[in-house]
Curated annotation (Swiss-Prot):
Keyword Phosphoprotein: yes
Catalytically driven reaction(s): alpha-D-glucosamine 1-phosphate = D-glucosamine 6-phosphate
Keyword tags: Isomerase, Magnesium, Metal-binding, Phosphoprotein
Residues modified as Phosphoserine: S102
Protein family per UniProt: Belongs to the phosphohexose mutase family.
Name under which the protein is recorded: Phosphoglucosamine mutase
GO molecular function ontology, one term from the record: phosphoglucosamine mutase activity
Coiled coil: none
UniProt KW Transcription keyword: no
Amino acid sequence: MKRRYFGTDGIRGQSNVFPMTPDLAMRVGIAAGTIFRRGNHRHRVVIGKDTRLSGYMLENAMVAGFTAAGLDAFILGPIPTPAVAMLTRSLRADLGVMISASHNPYEDNGIKLFGPDGYKLSDDIEAEIEDLLERDLNAQLAKSDDIGRAKRVDGVHDRYIEHAKRTLPRDVTLQGLRIAIDCANGAAYKVAPAVLWELGAEVVTIGNEPNGTNINLNCGSTSPVALQKKVDEVRADIGIALDGDADRVIIVDENGSIVDGDQLMAVIAESWAESQQLRGNGIVATVMSNLGLERFLDDKGLGLARTKVGDRYVVEHMRQHNYNVGGEQSGHIVLSDYGTTGDGLVAALQILAAVKRTGRTVSEVCRRFEPVPQLLRNVRISGGKPLEDIQVQKAIADAEAELARNGRLVIRPSGTEPLIRVMAEGDDRAQIERIVNELIGTISNVRTAA
């Protein structure tokens, strides 16, 4: 069934434009609150957000919805997404909410929902919420004496700081490291530098002055140029770039080179396998992860299980098959020993542990494999289903046959934007570029004709 509200990572869109309106946010609160209002205990929801201008507006709307449904609302304020997942469990809440559009610009916002176990909701539960959103919600409102209460909770940042610090192995200290960190003017602008400093590092921070409109603006994991310059300027040993809600991370080595999520997963997988911490004899990644990662793991006797794009699908596979390392090339790294969702800071701490234990530089530690040439391009669409066109399907089949075992092809609609994503990778860069350009042309022609 086609979804109207939920995408691959909750509900997302431009603020004050459907579906990201205060009205819908309140209705989501009522609908989700109704579904999780089970049992005779006093029900509660924890609500966090990042630093976007629209965050307070949507926070208030969701508080209204949840309290109207009879849940007490614990308001956390600006805080990372993984902290919301953690606090949902530790505060014994029935539901957790993160108001954020992750790496998107400030004009956008979104709603991510977590169950009482701290995991993102399943497709089935999201479908239940969508079904309720299409109905008259007045019948779901709590009785007058059962309306929930709202309160801001103090000390939540300290809880997360201590949690993050505990994920660094006890035999490791960050003393002697100069770390530059870019907080993307987002949710981790207070907690991330504090964690690194308390663990002994010399910390140089940028992207820690949010004003409501500068989240992810020329900063953070999707725009690491400022961090690269800062690493060079202060001669840092490493740069850490988080995104707006701190659930993803990109590393900059001492030479200013970018280290993506695939390389980070390789480092953690190899390190954890050596220490016998790795479960599942491999890791979980998406179809977008580089073929070079797969070959590296294979050489180490480790496997790579692939899922469709979206960290929630990575996590689902990890849970079903007992893996404890998974993630995405974009920098969503999920370490289930320490959390239920991607955590950029905790992932960075595992890289720092590998650096300290080996005594090698970040560039030496993090260049675990040579990436296979990979090209990703997008085609914007305004409607229709170009991937169902016979010409497009034939072009895809021909490209897959040409690549055979020497490469991979992934073509999929974006879960958050009106785009078709075309990715090809293989050992022959010229071949990859030609294949992608031909497919883009075919899809564009079909789109135009439609």
